[in-house]
Structures are given as C-alpha cells and as structure tokens.
Amino acid sequence: MKVHIVAVGKLKNGYVAEGVKDYYERIKHYIPITMVETKQENPFNMTTKEGFHIVLDAQGKLMTSEEFASFIEDLLTTQSNDVYFYIGGPEGFSEAFKNNAQMRISLSLMTFPHELARLFFLEQLYRALTIIKGEKYHK
C-alpha cells in the first residue's frame, strides 16, 4: 500500500513549502508516499482509480490525534490498495467530487488557508505514524 497526497494548487508561501517538505521527508521514513500538486479539482477519477479515497473537508469526521493514528494503523494493516488523501484549494471541492470519496475527514472546526491545511495534515500524518511506532514526538 502506498499513500498519495493529492493537493489542488501550488504552495506560494516559502515557509509553508519548507514545512510541507520537512514533514514529507519525515513521513517517507515510515511509509511509501507520493505528493502531487494539481490545478484541477479531479486530478484522479475516483470512480476508476482503485484505492481508498479520503477528502479533507470541513464537514468531515473529526478525530483526535490518537484516533487518527488508530485510523491510519487500521488502513496500513487492512488496506491492500493505495490510499488517496485529497486536499482542496481555496474553493474546496464540489459536492459531486466529495461524494465519490469513501470518507471525509476534517482537520478542525476552525477555518484555515488551504496551504496551511496541507501543512497541518502532513504534520498530523507524521504524528500518527510516530504514535503507531511508540515514538516520543507526540506528548
């Protein structure tokens, strides 16, 4: 299984891009991962792409870091197909796009710029992996 991060839009803020790169490099030590930036909402046709598709969405399921770690651990142990996480741009995703996903998750009840959402998600994915491994990053 490989994890794919599919993000709409390019990162424009240097400090955000540095943070995203840092967490991406850290995550690569734990799991196979790719990250793709795209201009369009539907970079992969979810109906023809095998895998488990998850959209980050403000109305998605809220989880604590520990619950997210448990969710990721379940995916890693039970999912043979690739897992896709979709992070929207400034306009988010259409309902039609979101309805094609198997799951929606939310990072917070608060609203963030899409660039920061990407950074926050990668940090949470890294945190989840360290929780799974019993490492001391999460306190």
From Swiss-Prot:
CDD domains in the record: RlmH-like
TM region positions: none
GO molecular function: rRNA (pseudouridine-N3-)-methyltransferase activity
Location within or outside the cell: Cytoplasm
A Pfam family of this chain: SPOUT_MTase
GO cellular component: cytoplasm
EC identifiers of the protein: 2.1.1.177
Enzymatic reactions: pseudouridine(1915) in 23S rRNA + S-adenosyl-L-methionine = N(3)-methylpseudouridine(1915) in 23S rRNA + S-adenosyl-L-homocysteine + H(+)
Source superkingdom: Bacteria
Record has Cytoplasm as a keyword: yes
Keywords: Cytoplasm, Methyltransferase, rRNA processing, S-adenosyl-L-methionine, Transferase
Binding site for S-adenosyl-L-methionine: L56, G88, L107, S108, L109, M110, T111, F112
Enzyme class: transferase
Record's function text: Specifically methylates the pseudouridine at position 1915 (m3Psi1915) in 23S rRNA.
Family: Belongs to the RNA methyltransferase RlmH family.
Subunit structure: Homodimer.
The protein's name in its UniProt record: Ribosomal RNA large subunit methyltransferase H
Species in which this protein is naturally found: Coprothermobacter proteolyticus (strain ATCC 35245 / DSM 5265 / OCM 4 / BT)
